[in-house]
Curated annotation (Swiss-Prot):
One GO BP: double-strand break repair via homologous recombination
Key words, A-Z: ATP-binding, DNA damage, DNA repair, DNA-binding, Exonuclease, Helicase, Hydrolase, Nuclease, Nucleotide-binding
Disulfide bonds: none
Designated name of the protein: ATP-dependent helicase/deoxyribonuclease subunit B
Cofactors: Mg(2+)
Family: Belongs to the helicase family. AddB/RexB type 2 subfamily.
GO MF entries: 5'-3' exonuclease activity; ATP binding; double-stranded DNA binding; helicase activity; hydrolase activity, acting on acid anhydrides
Keyword Heme: no
Matches recorded under SUPFAM superfamilies: P-loop containing nucleoside triphosphate hydrolases, Restriction endonuclease-like
Further information: Despite having helicase-like domains, this subunit does not have helicase activity.
Keyword set includes Nucleotide-binding: yes
Assembly mode: Heterodimer of AddA and RexB.
This enzyme's EC code(s): 3.1.-.-
Taxon lineage: Bacteria, Bacillati, Bacillota, Bacilli, Lactobacillales
C-alpha cells in the first residue's frame, strides 16, 4: 500500500492519475476508485488529465461497480435485493408473527415507518459486517430479542425466495478470500481518491485487496503543517489525518508528500492557511491581499428567490464572458428548501441544469393513480378518490371536459360510496345534465373497478394477475405513453414505469404463494411506489451542475456558487433516528474488530471542518458564498464559518432586491427580461432617474413591438381594481339589436348590488355549484308548492284536512322524495318545513274575505326601449270590493323599505304591481297592494309572558302578517285582515310615482348594461363598511383599500323619509 498526501494548492487527482499511468504503462490493470456521489465527475476529470484523453487500462469507477468486474461471471444467479423488496420481505415476516411474539415492537407490525427503519437497520448491519446477534448491550434486552426474531425470519424468507443476501462487496471479499481471483488481482493496481473514511465493509475489503493486489494507492489532502502536529483535535484536517494515521498504523507504512505540476491560485491557498491557523491555535502575521478578494464573494440576500435570481444573473454574465455552463457548479445548503425554487428560476433565465439528486416518485401521476386506487378500495368508493384517479390521466379514455362534467354531476347528486356509483344516475336539475352520456361513463368506470374490488382473500399471484388485467382494461400503459410532452418527460416516465414493474415483480415473487387481501396488496404496492426514487441523466454534458454542498470536492469547477449557507445548514448536524441510538451503536463498536457502525453524530465536527475546507477550495477561479436572511419563511443567522471569513477580511455584500437596471446581467436574456418587465408592470411605479426612465421606455417600446409580432400583450397595471368594457363584437352577440333585453327583479337587484356580479351571473352565466341536498332555494320551492295546492283546493273539506292533503301530496312528488328522503338530515329538514306550513297556514284561514284569483302567474312586462321584464307572481288576491293585490312568499323576513327601493335594491313588489296592472282585467282598475308573507314557525320567549292566555295567541298571529305596499284607498277593507299597514299606505299618486321610478331604474340599468362596461362597485350605506357582494375571490376587493369604488347609497333621516324619497323619485323619473 502507498499513502500519499498533498497541500490544497495542488491537485491530488493529477498526482494519482500519474501513479495510475505509471502502473498502466507497466501493463497493470488500474481501477481508479471514487466515492459514489463523485464517480461521474471524477471520471471526466481523470480522462481530461490523461494525455490521450482515454484508455482501456484505467477504469474510473466505484467500489461496488469494481466488484462486479471481478464477480460478474462467478456470482450466483439470485434475485437482487433493493429497498422496496426488503420492505416487502419484512412486511411478510411481520405478518407471520403475532403481537405477543414481539413485546417491544408488537404494536408497530403494520407501521410503514417501522418497516422502513428495519430496512435501514438491516442495510447498516451489512455495511458494518455485523449480524443481528451482535446487537448486544442494547438499552432493553427485549429489543434484541424482537429484532432477532424479525430479521432471522426475514432472512429465512430471502433464502426461500432465492434472494442474494450478500452485498456486491461481500461477494467480492468472499471470492478473494477463497483465492478465486488471485491471478487477476496480481495484475491489478487500485487507486483510491476522495475518501476520508471507509465503512467496515470497505475496510475489510481493502485489507484483502492489499494482500492480493499488486499495489493499493490512497491519496488525501493534508497540509505538511498539520501532518507534523501532535495534537490534531479541532484541526481542519482532522478527518484526513485520522484517516491516514489509521491506515499507516494498520499497514505499517509511512505516508509520503507529493506535489502536482498544476498549482491553483494563491488566493485559495492563503485563505486555507488562515482557516487552518484559526483552528490549530497558531498565528500568522499576514492577511489576504487585495487581489485575493477578486476570487471570493460573500453575498447576503433577503430570501431564497432573490438569492437564486442573483446567481442566475451572474451565470448569464459568465456566459457573456465566454465561459460554458459546464464550468459552473451550484451548491445548495438545504437541498429540500431550494429544490422546488431553483428549477423555475433557472428555466426563466434559460439556464440548463442537472440536479444531482434522485427524484422521489411521490408526485408522479402513476403514483397518484395507485394511491387513489388503494384509497377507493379502502374507503368504499369515496368520490374524491374516484375523481383523483380519473384526473391522473391514466384511467380509461376520457377527455378533461368529460371528467369535469362527471365531477360536476357527482357533486350535485352527492354520489359517493359503491351503492350510489353502481346505480344508474337518474336525478337531474335545471341544468339538464346529459344522463345518458354520464351513465355510459359511469359504467366504463365502475365495471373494471367492481371486478377488481370484489376479489376475496387469495394468493398474491392471483391478485397480481387480476390487477394486471384491470390495468389492461383501463389502458394504463397506453395512457402512460400519452402523458409525456417532451423527451425529458419520456425518459422520466420510462424510469417510473420500470420501477413500477419491478415492484409488481417483487410482490409476485415474495407474496405469490401467500394469501392476502386486496387492500393489503394495494397498500404494499402504494408504499413501494411512494418511497421509490428515480434519476434521469442529462441529455448534454454542457449544463450547470447542482448538488448538495457536502458532496463537493476541492477544485471541482472554475466557478462555484454555494447558496443557503445559514447557521442551521452550514455546518450540518447529523443525528441518527433509527431503531438504535448512537449510544447503543457506540457500545457495540467497542467490542468489535473490523466491524463497526458508522456514528455520524460522533464525527460531525471533523466532517464539517473537512466539508468547509473542500468548499472553500471548490473553485479554481471564483467562489461565491451566499446566505439568505430568511429561509423556509424562518429567519436564520450567518454560518460560523462565514463569520470566520469576514474576520479574514472578506467583505459581506448586501445584494438587496433585484432592481431593474441596464447592466448586462439584467438585460442580457430576453426571457428573463420579459418576466421582469411583467413584474414591474404589476407593481406601483418605483422612483427612477430621468436616464432610467428613458432607457426603460425604449426597452418597453421594443418589447411591445416584438410581442405584437407574436400576438401577445403585457398585462395592464392592476394596482387599482378596474374592468375593461366588452368589445363591440361581444356586445353584439350578448345584446343583439332588435331583441329586447330580458331583465327580472332579481337581476335588477344584483345589478345595483354590484355591477360586476351582474356580469358574472347574467352575461357569463356563471352559477354556483348545485346540490341535491335541500337548500334555501329548494325549501322555498317546497313551501310554495304546499301553499299552491292548499289555495287551489275549493272543496268543502275542513281547512286542517285540506292542509294535510296538500302536505301529503307535495311529499309524494318524485323530486321532493329524492331530496327529502335521501338521509336523516333531509328528513329532519322536511319535518321543520311541515311545522312552518302548519304554523303559517292559519293566516290563510283567517282571511275568508280574500279570493285567490291566480297562483304562480308568469308575466312579461314591456318597459319600452327593448326591455322585457319577466317573473312569476306567487299569488294574486282579490278583496271583496274587486281590487287586486299580489302576495310573494318568503322563507325569511322581508318588508318594503322605500330607501332600499330608491337605491335599486328592492324592486320586486313594485315590479309585480306594474305587471299586475298590465295583466289585470279591463274592468278592474284598483290595486290594493303588494306584500310579502313570511313563511315561519314563530318563536316566542315565554319568560316575557306572565301567564298562558289569549295574549300568547295574539303574539303568534301578530308575527304572521302581510307586510309590504298598500293602497290608502283600500284602507277600510284591509283593516279586517292580517295586513301590517302602519307606515305602509300610499295614495294612488304615490303608487304611480313608485311605478314610474321603478321603470326608470330598469331603463337606467339597461342603458348601462348595453354599453358592456361593468364596474366593481359593491354598495356601502355609511362609507365605512361594504354591504354589497364584494366577490373577493374573483375581484380581490378590499374594503379598506377600495372603498372609493363602492357605490354610496342615498340615505335620509327617518323623519319625513317617505316624502323626501318620493320627491327625489319624481325629479329623477321625469328627467
Amino acid at each position: 500500500m502507498k499513502l500519499i498526501y498533498t497541500e490544497m494548492s495542488y491537485s491530488m487527482t493529477e498526482i494519482l492519475v500519474n501513479e495510475a499511468r505509471k502502473a498502466a504503462d507497466q501493463g497493470y490493470r488500474v481501477f481508479y476508485i471514487a466515492p459514489n456521489s463523485l464517480s461521474f465527475e471524477k471520471e471526466r476529470e481523470v480522462l481530461t488529465l490523461l494525455p490521450e484523453r482515454g484508455t482501456f487500462s484505467i477504469i474510473v469507477t466505484r467500489f461496488v461497480q469494481m466488484s462486479r468486474y471481478f464477480t460478474v461471471e462467478s456470482s450466483p444467479s439470485k434475485q437482487h435485493l433493493d429497498d422496496t423488496t426488503l420492505a416487502m420481505i419484512f412486511y411478510r415476516a411481520l405478518m407471520q408473527l403475532k403481537p405477543e411474539d414481539l413485546p417491544s415492537y408488537g404494536r408497530l407490525q403494520n407501521n410503514s415507518v417501522f418497516i422502513e427503519q428495519l430496512v435501514e437497520l438491516y442495510k447498516e448491519l451489512k455495511n458494518a459486517q455485523l449480524s443481528v446477534h451482535d446487537l448486544t448491550g442494547l438499552d432493553h434486552p427485549q429489543k434484541q430479542e424482537d429484532l432477532i426474531k424479525i430479521i432471522e425470519l426475514a432472512e429465512t424468507i430471502m433464502i426461500q425466495q432465492d434472494y442474494n443476501q450478500d452485498s456486491p462487496l461481500q461477494s467480492f471479499a468472499r471470492a478473494i478470500k477463497l483465492g478465486l481471483l488471485n491471478n487477476q488481482l496480481s495484475k491489478t493496481v487500485i487507486v483510491i481518491d476522495g475518501f476520508s473514511r471507509f465503512s467496515a465493509e470497505e475496510d475489510y475489503l481493502l485489507s484483502l485487496l492489499n494482500n492480493n493486489c499488486q499495489e493499493v494507492i490512497i491519496g488525501s489532502y493534508v497540509s505538511q503543517k498539520a501532518y507534523q502536529k501532535s495534537f490534531i483535535k479541532g484541526n481542519i484536517y482532522e478527518a484526513s489525518l485520522h484517516f491516514l494515521q489509521d491506515l499507516a498504523q494498520k499497514y505499517h507504512i509511512k505516508p509520503v508528500f507529493a506535489t502536482s505540476n498544476q498549482v491553483f491560485k494563491p488566493a485559495f491557498s492563503r485563505l486555507t492557511q488562515l482557516f487552518e491557523a484559526t483552528h490549530d491555535f497558531s498565528q500568522v502575521d499576514w492577511q489576504l491581499q487585495k487581489n485575493d478578494l477578486d476570487h471570493f464573494s460573500l453575498w447576503q440576500c433577503h430570501h431564497q428567490k432573490e438569492e437564486i435570481e442573483h446567481v442566475a444573473k451572474s451565470i448569464r454574465q459568465k456566459l457573456y464572458e465566454g465561459y460554458r455552463y459546464k464550468d459552473i457548479l451550484v451548491l445548495l445548503g438545504d437541498m429540500d428548501a431550494y429544490q422546488l425554487q431553483i428549477g423555475p428560476i433557472f428555466d426563466k433565465f434559460e439556464i440548463p441544469y442537472y440536479l444531482g439528486k434522485a427524484e422521489p416518485m411521490a408526485a408522479h401521476p402513476l403514483v397518484q393513480f395507485i394511491e387513489s386506487l388503494e384509497r377507493s378500495q379502502r374507503y368504499n368508493w369515496r368520490r374524491e378518490d374516484i375523481l383523483n384517479m380519473l384526473k391522473s390521466g391514466l384511467f380509461g379514455c376520457f377527455d378533461d371536459s368529460d371528467i369535469d362534467r362527471f365531477e360536476e354531476y357527482t357533486q350535485f347528486a352527492d354520489i359517493k360510496g359503491f351503492t350510489k356509483f353502481s346505480k344508474p344516475f337518474t336525478i337531474n336539475s335545471s341544468r339538464q345534465y346529459p344522463l345518458d352520456f354520464l351513465n355510459e361513463m359511469r359504467q366504463d368506470i365502475v365495471l373494471p373497478l367492481q371486478e377488481l374490488f370484489k376479489s376475496q382473500k387469495q394468493l398474491g399471484a392471483s391478485l397480481i394477475d387480476k390487477l394486471i388485467l384491470f390495468l389492461e382494461k383501463i389502458r394504463l400503459a397506453e395512457n402512460m405513453q400519452g402523458l409525456a410532452q417532451s423527451q425529458l418527460e419520456v425518459e422520466k416516465n420510462e424510469e417510473v414505469w420500470k420501477r413500477f414493474t419491478d415492484i409488481l415483480t417483487s410482490f409476485h415473487h415474495i407474496f405469490g404463494q401467500e394469501k392476502l387481501r386486496l387492500s393489503d396488496c394495494l397498500a404494499l404496492i402504494k408504499t413501494g411506489m411512494k418511497s421509490a426514487q428515480y434519476r434521469v441523466v442529462p441529455a448534454t454534458l454542457d449544463v450547470v451542475t447542482i448538488k448538495s454542498y457536502d458532496l463537493v470536492q476541492p477544485h471541482s469547477k472554475p466557478f462555484v456558487y454555494a447558496i443557503g449557507l445559514t447557521q442551521s445548514h452550514f455546518p450540518k448536524q447529523i443525528h441518527h433516528s433509527g431503531l438504535l441510538s448512537d449510544q447503543e451503536r457506540a457500545r457495540i463498536n467497542e467490542i468489535r474488530n473490523y466491524r463497526h457502525f458508522d456514528i455520524a453524530s460522533a464525527e460531525n465536527s471533523k466532517k464539517n471542518h473537512q466539508t468547509a475546507l473542500s468548499l472553500f477550495n471548490a473553485a479554481t477561479k471564483e467562489l461565491v458564498l451566499s446566505v439568505p436572511t430568511v429561509i423556509n419563511e424562518t429567519f436564520d443567522d450567518l454560518s460560523p464559518y462565514l463569520k470566520e471569513l469576514i474576520n479574514f477580511g472578506l467583505p459581506l455584500l448586501d445584494k438587496g432586491k433585484n432592481y431593474l437596471s441596464y447592466d448586462n446581467s439584467d438585460i442580457g436574456n430576453y426571457k428573463a427580461l420579459l418576466s421582469q418587465i411583467i413584474a414591474i408592470n404589476r407593481q406601483d411605479l418605483i422612483e427612477m432617474s430621468d436616464q432610467d426612465k428613458m432607457f426603460w421606455t425604449v426597452v418597453l417600446r421594443y418589447l411591445r413591438k416584438q410581442l405584437r409580432k407574436q400576438q401577445l400583450e403585457l398585462p395592464t397595471s392592476d394596482y387599482r381594481l378596474s374592468t375593461k368594457p366588452l368589445s363591440k363584437e361581444v356586445i353584439e352577440v350578448c345584446f343583439p339589436k332588435g331583441i329586447p333585453l330580458k331583465l327580472s327583479a332579481t337581476a335588477l337587484t344584483v345589478f345595483y348590488n354590484n355591477q360586476y356580479n351582474y356580469f358574472l351571473k347574467y352575461v357569463l352565466n356563471l352559477n354556483k355549484t348545485e346540490s341535491i341536498h335541500p337548500d334555501s332555494r329548494i325549501h322555498g320551492q317546497y313551501l310554495h308548492r304546499v301553499f299552491e295546492r292548499l289555495m287551489k283546493d275549493h272543496t268543502q273539506e275542513p281547512f286542517d284536512n285540506k292542509l294535510k292533503q296538500a302536505i301529503y301530496h307535495t311529499n309524494q312528488e318524485s323530486f321532493f322524495q329524492q331530496v327529502y328522503q335521501d338521509n336523516a338530515e333531509a328528513e329532519y329538514s322536511l319535518a321543520i318545513l311541515e311545522d312552518i306550513v302548519r304554523s303559517t297556514a292559519p293566516i290563510l284561514q283567517l282571511n275568508q274575505n280574500i279570493k285567490v284569483i291566480d297562483q304562480e302567474k308568469n308575466f312579461h312586462l314591456d318597459m319600452g326601449n327593448e326591455i322585457l321584464v319577466h317573473g312569476i307572481i306567487d299569488r294574486i288576491d282579490q278583496l271583496s270590493d274587486g281590487s287586486l293585490g299580489i302576495v310573494d312568499y318568503k322563507s325569511s323576513a322581508n318588508q318594503f323599505d322605500i330607501g332600499t327601493f330608491y337605491n335599486g335594491l328592492s324592486p320586486q313588489l313594485v315590479t309585480y304591481l306594474a305587471a299586475l296592472k298590465q295583466i289585470a282585467p279591463h274592468d278592474i282598475n284598483q290595486l290594493f297592494g303588494a306584500m310579502y308573507l313570511h313563511l315561519q314557525d314563530p318563536k316566542l320567549d315565554l319568560v316575557t309572558f306572565k301567564q298562558i292566555d289569549n295574549t300568547l295567541v295574539e303574539s303568534i298571529y301578530k308575527a304572521l302578517t302581510y307586510k309590504g305596499i298598500f293602497s290608502e284607498v283600500e284602507k277600510e277593507h284591509l283593516s279586517t285582515g292580517a295586513y301590517q299597514t302602519k307606515n305602509a299606505l300610499y295614495s294612488n299618486d304615490e303608487l304611480e310615482t313608485l311605478l314610474n321610478y321603478n321603470k326608470y331604474l330598469y331603463l337606467k340599468a339597461a342603458k348601462h348594461i348595453k354599453k358592456g362596461h361593468f364596474l366593481i362597485n359593491p354598495y356601502t350605506s355609511d362609507g365605512k363598511t361594504v354591504q354589497g357582494d364584494q366577490l373577493k375571490a374573483i375581484t380581490r376587493f378590499e374594503a379598506d383599500l377600495d372603498m372609493a369604488q363602492a357605490r354610496r347609497l342615498v340615505t335620509l333621516p327617518a323623519k319625513e323619509k317617505k316624502e323626501c324619497f318620493l320627491t327625489l323619485m319624481r325629479k329623477e323619473s321625469h328627467l
